């Protein structure tokens, strides 16, 4: 395979003075025979034959063309076709005249166009003796045969990627994904230092050298590339001694690597802490996923890390296992993972103890020891989503909101504040838009909104999400400006956010409305003590500062 990343410069006659002005491009939908101006310097393009697809080459790509160049009087001065030899150059690098750089980047594969290039974008006042006179306008009949993308993927010149075979679709692997690749790594003299006909690794963990992980993140499935790798992305200043089948890499050696991304398994990190890992073994259908409250049908096999099977449901002669999400029917990690799956998907889910059986032993088909990480293979056979607001009429929305509120209350009493918060959020969403409600329905809706947002604010305070607690209380006060609970809870949130002035405003207003409220009075007392303490600290700080400013220096004392 050709390892050369230096693109041929072509005939001397074709060399330009610089990269040129890249303004302007082909307008959309040019028809055969139509002529358009590109940019504002007089470059014209006439379409002779349409190309394929929509892609056009980019700056840095190696393009391959056939061309015939003529003066305006029709006199031919050069032709690759006459030589039966295609011409290659690197687009946008000043290897050709400016008119070529600007014009060819508007072409599609297989396209044939006639470019009329003014002197300013060709050879100018000097011309190119003896064939091209000074100030000559030139015409080039150009056919774009193909191009090869060359990308500086590290953005520092450390890794250049040349695409040899385009991949499928548009997705690229991410850090958590497991990729399967084939590669051959060589020194610049062609010595093979490492080779594999198939190896799997997690992108963020890397393999062989840093260049492989960086490269695969830019590749599509089935893509084949040639990498030119500087030492900092290879084996660095130290190099590598020979080991097993791997050859030695000298210090500060550059590498050339053939790399093919055969496939990869998508790994999703679930949850704010990203501790639940879902690896897709079989892709699913469509884009729909279950929502909270959906009834799902699954096949599951639960294993310990040593491979011991402790649970198997829905396989062989068994009916598929059915449960309702977000109802604690299964362990939390499995519940969360299923919410991230599509119908027909098969996934391997790795769940740490805090989202599995915790620090207690669990007796299943086999014993799950305390603090065990468990692994589930899950197939989502089907699901029926819980109804959303748009699925319901007005009376059903109010009824559903009331039901979710009661579910939230039960969860709150059990100390399950995060799950309770979600119930209150869903209840509020059912009645968020009430413009079509009757007057009686609007009254019910208003009261439900107040209750759900107040209760949710209580959840957020328990969860230490003080900013959200403040926002929820503000929503309540927009509906009922004299709501004591909303003022009281917002004051609590402001206090935790160290905004004591706003907290004092709210608590004073709450006391004006309900002077005998014990909780409000106690909170006001605590708040005043905090403010007093802060004022004391501030006074001491400023006193010390002013004392330093007014204290005479040693020289002044002597005087």
Swiss-Prot record:
GO terms for cellular component: cytoplasm. Induction: By heat shock. One of its GO terms (molecular function) is peptidyl-prolyl cis-trans isomerase activity. It comes from the Eukaryota. Residues 1-34 are annotated as: Disordered. It holds the Pfam family FKBP_C. InterPro entries: FKBP4/5/8-like, PPIase_dom_sf, PPIase_FKBP_dom, TPR-like_helical_dom_sf, TPR_rpt. The keyword Isomerase applies. Its EC number is 5.2.1.8. Keywords: Calmodulin-binding, Isomerase, Repeat, Rotamase, Stress response, TPR repeat. It catalyses: [protein]-peptidylproline (omega=180) = [protein]-peptidylproline (omega=0). TPR repeats lie at residues 401-434, 450-483, 484-517. It is an enzyme of class 5 (isomerase). GO terms for biological process: chaperone-mediated protein folding. Residues 60-148, 176-265, 293-384 form the PPIase FKBP-type domain. Residues 17-27 have a biased composition (Gly residues). This PPIase probably binds calmodulin. PPIases accelerate the folding of proteins during protein synthesis. This is 70 kDa peptidyl-prolyl isomerase.
């Amino acid at each position: 395979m050709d390892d050369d990343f230096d693109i041929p410069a072509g005939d001397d006659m074709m060399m330009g003075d610089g990269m040129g002005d890249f303004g302007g491009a082909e307008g959309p939908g040019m028809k055969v025979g139509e002529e358009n101006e590109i940019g504002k310097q007089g470059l014209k393009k006439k379409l002779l034959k349409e190309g394929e697809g929509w892609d056009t080459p980019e700056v840095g790509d190696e393009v391959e063309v056939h061309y015939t160049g003529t003066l305006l009087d029709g006199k031919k001065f050069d032709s690759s076709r006459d030589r039966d030899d295609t011409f290659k150059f690197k687009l946008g690098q000043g290897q050709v005249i400016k008119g070529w750089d600007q014009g060819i980047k508007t072409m599609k594969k297989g396209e044939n166009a006639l470019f009329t290039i003014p002197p300013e974008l060709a050879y100018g006042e000097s011309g190119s003796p003896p064939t091209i006179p000074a100030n000559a306008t030139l015409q080039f009949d150009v056919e774009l045969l193909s191009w090869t993308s060359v990308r500086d993927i590290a953005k520092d010149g450390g890794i250049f990627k040349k695409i040899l075979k385009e991949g499928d679709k548009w997705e690229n692997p991410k850090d958590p994904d497991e990729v399967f690749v084939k590669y051959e790594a060589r020194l610049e003299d062609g010595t093979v230092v490492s080779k594999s006909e198939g190896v799997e690794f997690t992108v963020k963990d890397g393999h062989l050298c840093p260049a492989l992980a960086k490269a695969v993140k830019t590749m599509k499935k089935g893509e084949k590339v040639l990498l030119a790798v500087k030492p900092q992305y290879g084996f660095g200043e130290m190099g590598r001694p020979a080991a097993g089948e791997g050859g030695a890499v000298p210090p500060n050696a550059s590498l050339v690597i053939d790399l093919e991304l055969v496939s990869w398994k998508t790994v999703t990190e679930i949850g704010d802490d990203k501790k639940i890992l879902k690896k897709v073994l079989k892709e699913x259908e469509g884009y729909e996923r279950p929502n909270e409250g959906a009834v799902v049908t699954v096949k599951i096999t639960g294993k310990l890390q040593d491979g011991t099977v402790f649970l198997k449901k829905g396989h062989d002669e068994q009916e598929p296992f059915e449960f309702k999400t977000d109802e604690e029917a299964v362990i939390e990690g499995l519940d969360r993972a299923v919410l991230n799956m599509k119908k027909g998907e098969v996934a391997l889910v790795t769940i740490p103890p805090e989202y599995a059986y915790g620090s207690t032993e669990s007796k299943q088909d086999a014993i799950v020891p305390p603090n065990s990480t468990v692994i589930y293979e899950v197939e989502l056979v089907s699901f029926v989503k819980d109804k959303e607001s748009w699925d319901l009429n007005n009376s059903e929305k109010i009824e559903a909101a009331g039901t979710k509120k009661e579910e939230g209350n039960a969860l709150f009493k059990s100390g399950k504040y995060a799950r309770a918060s979600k119930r209150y959020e869903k209840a509020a969403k059912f009645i968020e838009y009430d413009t079509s409600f009757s007057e009686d329905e609007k009254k019910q809706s208003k009261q439900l909104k107040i209750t759900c947002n107040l209760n949710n604010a209580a959840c957020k305070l328990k969860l230490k999400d003080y900013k959200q607690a403040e926002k929820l209380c503000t929503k309540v006060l927009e509906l009922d400006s004299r709501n004591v609970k909303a003022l009281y809870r917002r004051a609590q949130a402001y206090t935790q956010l160290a905004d004591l002035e706003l907290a004092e405003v709210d608590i004073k207003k709450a006391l004006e409305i309900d002077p005998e409220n014990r909780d409000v009075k106690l909170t006001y007392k605590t708040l005043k003590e905090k403010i007093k303490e802060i004022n004391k600290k501030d006074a001491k700080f400023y006193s010390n500062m002013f004392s330093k400013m007014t204290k005479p220096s040693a020289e002044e004392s002597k005087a």
